[in-house]
């Protein structure tokens, strides 16, 4: 089972918005040095919505190759077309991803039965561990706990990234899910509490900026060292907040650029961080120890 800090990796781009492979390779190595436990390639934070299919798969392959088996790589392969999600998931498996993360179908707003059948179909089509991803604030559809628990019985479905920040929902899932079905936070601010309830880790935006701190926070929480984990989280709360002053990944890409790790590229319709938020993000980074 994949546990701990799973960075939702940004996708580096040159100023002209072409993909920056050198920076991607360096970012992967930096995360390995900093103790990140797994890498999520081409999720929301990785700008999956504005990468074409070839770019999407190239990023996954390059991350897999650079990691070279040292930590797990989870590939973002969700789509609002079931057949497209199957193709992406199979392609990610073919290039060596350890698991896939599949966001609930967005915009077309399927019913709960539609969500179940969508994910069941993909799980039956491709034999790779698959994590459901529930983020209703972005998709316009909320996978109810009952649906997630039905899917937890389906072979190849390994867990869920629950990004609502609702700890009561997380508690219900943790209490009722079968053994081996992972509940993973998709909300940095509440990740410690979810892990302490019995969750397995945090698919983290903030880990792009302070990977060692998020890794340590997750390790402490998994070990049941609640106060120590909470102490780290309290220090990071301004940074968690700053990462969402504008739509993700706008703030986090700007922050990683300030660290000198990537260039300024971000693809329309996303834009660079508005000047009015620069100081807030800088201050949050300083409070986090940077």
UniProtKB/Swiss-Prot annotation:
Keywords: Amino-acid biosynthesis, Cytoplasm, Diaminopimelate biosynthesis, Lyase, Lysine biosynthesis, Schiff base. PROSITE patterns: DHDPS_1, DHDPS_2. It comes from the Bacteria. It catalyses: L-aspartate 4-semialdehyde + pyruvate = (2S,4S)-4-hydroxy-2,3,4,5-tetrahydrodipicolinate + H2O + H(+). Its EC number is 4.3.3.7. Pyruvate binds at residues 45, 203. The active site is at residues 133, 161. It is found in: Cytoplasm. The record marks 44, 107 as: Part of a proton relay during catalysis. The keyword Transcription regulation does not apply. Pathway: Amino-acid biosynthesis; L-lysine biosynthesis via DAP pathway; (S)-tetrahydrodipicolinate from L-aspartate: step 3/4. GO terms for molecular function: 4-hydroxy-tetrahydrodipicolinate synthase activity. One of its GO terms (biological process) is lysine biosynthetic process via diaminopimelate. Homotetramer; dimer of dimers. HAMAP family: DapA (MF_00418). Catalyzes the condensation of (S)-aspartate-beta-semialdehyde [(S)-ASA] and pyruvate to 4-hydroxy-tetrahydrodipicolinate (HTPA). PANTHER family: 4-HYDROXY-2-OXOGLUTARATE ALDOLASE, MITOCHONDRIAL, DIHYDRODIPICOLINATE SYNTHASE. Belongs to the DapA family. This is 4-hydroxy-tetrahydrodipicolinate synthase.
């Amino acid at each position: 089972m994949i546990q701990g800090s799973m960075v939702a990796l940004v996708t580096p781009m040159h100023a002209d918005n072409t993909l920056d492979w050198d920076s991607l390779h360096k970012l992967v190595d930096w995360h390995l040095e900093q103790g990140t436990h797994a890498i999520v390639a081409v999720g929301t934070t990785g700008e999956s919505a504005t990468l074409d299919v070839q770019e999407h798969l190239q990023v996954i392959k390059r991350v897999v190759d650079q990691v070279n088996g040292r930590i797990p790589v989870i590939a973002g392969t969700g789509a609002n077309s079931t057949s497209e999600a199957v193709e992406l998931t199979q392609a990610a498996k073919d290039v060596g991803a350890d698991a896939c993360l599949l966001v609930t179908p967005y915009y077309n707003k399927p019913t709960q039965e539609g969500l179940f059948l969508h994910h069941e179909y993909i799980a039956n089509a491709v034999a790779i561990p698959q994590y459901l991803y529930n983020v209703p604030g972005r998709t316009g559809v909320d996978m109810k706990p009952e649906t997630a628990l039905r899917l937890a019985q389906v072979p190849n479905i390994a867990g869920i990234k629950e990004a609502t920040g609702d700890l009561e929902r997380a508690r219900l899932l943790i209490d009722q899910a079968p053994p081996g079905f992972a509940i993973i936070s998709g909300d940095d601010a509440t990740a410690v509490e979810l892990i302490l309830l019995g969750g397995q880790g945090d698919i983290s935006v903030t880990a792009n900026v302070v990977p060692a701190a998020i890794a340590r926070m997750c390790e402490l929480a998994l070990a049941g060292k609640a106060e120590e984990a909470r102490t780290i989280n309290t220090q990071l709360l301004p940074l968690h907040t700053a990462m969402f002053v504008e739509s993700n990944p706008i703030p986090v890409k700007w922050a990683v650029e300030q660290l000198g790790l990537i260039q300024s590229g971000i693809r329309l319709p996303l834009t660079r961080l508005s000047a009015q938020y620069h100081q807030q993000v800088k201050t949050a980074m300083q409070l986090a120890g940077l």
